[in-house]
């Protein structure tokens, strides 16, 4: 199942967003245009649906509803998210979940529901506020999505949204996890617990996935011959990734993750996440620390690794190399264009000049990136200290 359509109102950078989504989505825009905030809408729904989450925590973790609400919002201050779930982009609507949020005008100023609605096919499953909500307004501080006793009729939606994962690997966290003390972030968005996740996977699946990753790394990383997962009993059972490199010695040279390059660690984290499960995956700038030749192959690699289980992947990027792949289509590319009234989001295929240039043989990277360049960029050269 995938999110086939999303509508946002007054969410972060956006006054209004209304776009269809496919199995693969590329988010393209200048700095501070809202690419991360667009992805955060999916994480927000996940934080409501997951165990130990809920509406109050999801809003509180983001600094309150006033921090979430678009700065350009005026007469209509409600924050709204509406997602359509389908088995594929070509199939009809399977589920639809919509939520609107307000803030109390006095007292604790808690966020509460303006509405919560669920449809299955064309049938309305839930429409809040209902009579019980009107009798007890405190009920509107919680969604039915987060309550096991209340979401029985649409638990498939809750399980799907709870499964959304986000990845933006920080190599230093993998290389030196014990140097960063304190509780980790929920969902491990930066890969700190990658080795623990690998260790918890059953042995057969672990070997299969590591073999596939090894095959890719042998192409991308010179002299790498073998990748394995080991547990060092001398260190009290601490897990490690170990690579064998071709060397003048017959057995080769061994290195552990603390000696891997940033690019190698990011590639391992990316490939493992793509193999991990069928839930939607949010990737933040996967091109970082990678050689340009590898980056150019990422779209095709992601497509091959996800086409079997139809996993949805949403990718934010600044990379011309990543978008140079002729397989990246205008229908799966969203252009984010900032303005004083908020960022607009449109598919690249909606621009006639982009369609014409693509028909002429250019790539999305050639035609889309120049369109979203900030104005007056040449003035940056005039900057003096």
Identify the role of each PLM range.
Residues 89-225:
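Electropositive, glycine-dotted interaction segments
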Residues 16-22, 273-275, 307:
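Phosphate-binding P-loop
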Residues 40-106:
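Conserved P-loop NTP-binding catalytic core
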Residues 1-15:
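N-terminal pre-Walker A segment at the start of P-loop NTPase domains
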Residues 2, 297-385:
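C-terminal lobe/lid and adjacent interdomain/linker elements of RecA-like ASCE P-loop ATPase modules
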Residues 11, 30, 286:
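P-loop (Walker A) phosphate-binding loop of NTP-binding proteins
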Residues 210, 215-218, 225-275, 280-293:
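Conserved ABC ATPase signature
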Residues 23-62, 190-193, 267-276, 291, ...:
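Phosphate-binding glycine-rich loops of NTP-binding sites
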């Amino acid at each position: 199942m995938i999110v086939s359509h999303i509508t946002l109102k007054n969410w972060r950078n956006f006054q209004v967003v209304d776009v269809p989504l496919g199995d693969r989505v590329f988010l393209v825009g200048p700095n501070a245009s809202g690419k991360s905030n667009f992805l955060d809408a999916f994480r927000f729904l996940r934080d409501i649906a997951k165990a130990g989450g809920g509406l109050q925590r999801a809003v509180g973790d983001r600094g309150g509803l006033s921090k979430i609400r678009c700065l350009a919002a005026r007469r209509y201050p409600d924050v709204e998210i509406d997602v359509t779930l389908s088995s594929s982009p070509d199939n009809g609507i399977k589920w639809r979940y919509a939520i609107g949020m307000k803030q109390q005008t006095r007292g604790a100023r808690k966020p509460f529901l303006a509405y919560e609605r669920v449809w299955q096919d064309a049938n309305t499953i839930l429409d809040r506020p209902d009579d019980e909500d009107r009798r007890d307004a405190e009920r509107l501080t919680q969604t039915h999505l987060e309550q096991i006793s209340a979401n029985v009729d649409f638990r498939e939606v809750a399980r799907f949204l709870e499964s959304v994962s986000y990845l933006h690997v920080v190599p230093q966290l993998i290389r030196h996890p014990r140097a960063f003390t304190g509780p980790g972030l929920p969902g491990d968005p930066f890969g700190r617990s990658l080795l623990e996740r690998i260790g918890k996977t059953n042995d057969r699946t672990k070997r299969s996935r590591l073999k596939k990753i090894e095959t890719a790394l042998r192409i991308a990383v010179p002299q790498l011959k073998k990748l394995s997962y080991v547990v060092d009993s001398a260190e009290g059972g601490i897990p490690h990734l170990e690579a064998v490199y071709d060397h003048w010695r017959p057995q080769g040279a061994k290195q552990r993750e603390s000696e891997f390059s940033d690019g190698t660690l990011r590639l391992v984290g990316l490939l493992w996440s793509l193999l991990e499960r069928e839930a939607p995956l949010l990737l933040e700038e996967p091109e970082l620390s990678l050689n340009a030749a590898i980056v150019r192959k990422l779209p095709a690699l992601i497509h091959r690794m996800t086409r079997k289980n139809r996993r949805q992947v949403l990718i934010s990027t600044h990379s011309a190399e990543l978008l140079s792949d002729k397989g990246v289509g205008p229908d799966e590319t969203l252009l984010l264009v900032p303005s004083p009234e908020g960022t607009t989001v449109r598919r690249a295929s909606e621009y006639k000049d982009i369609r014409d240039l693509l028909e002429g043989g250019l790539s999305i990277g050639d035609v889309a990136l120049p369109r979203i360049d900030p104005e007056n960029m040449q003035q940056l050269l005039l900057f003096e200290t």
